[in-house]
Amino acid sequence: MQKAQPKIYVVEDNPVYQTLVLKQLENITQDIRVFSTGENFLAELTCRPDLIILDYNLDGCINGYDVLKELKKLTYTSPVIFFSSNLEISVTSSILKLGVVEYIEKTIFTLPRLKTSITHILESSMGADVDTNKHEW
């Protein structure tokens, strides 16, 4: 019996970082949706993903903080990792108060940490080991 693939939503406007994050996810799941704006993400949010990776600065009218506030209003309980280059203390403090599980500075050097965090969060929330070494085709 095949394990259910974790559903991960990535909200990131930078195409380079979209690709880099997808590379970190390739051995974890194939069930990934990428959104470039907070508006598109919220408009297409029809089910509860197992994990959301969210940037702060996004194209469009709303930023990652606004997306997170809207998720809380809608009572979504999906774990959220903030992966952003915005490290202002006021932003970080506000986001942590809204319940993100991790805030990771967005650089190419922190991508391994992002992958480790994703694996740990999925194992914790899904109650099963997440296989990061091979695909189940």
Identify the residue ranges that each predicted region occupies:
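As written
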Residues: 95-101
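Receiver (REC) domain switch/output surface
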Residues: 113-126
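Short, conserved "switch-loop" micro-motifs in signal-transduction and mechanochemical regulators
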Residues: 86-87
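Short amphipathic alpha-helix used as the core "switch/output" element in two-component signaling
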Residues: 63-76
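Acidic, metal-coordinating helix/loop segments flanking the phosphotransfer/catalytic sites
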Residues: 34-51, 56-59
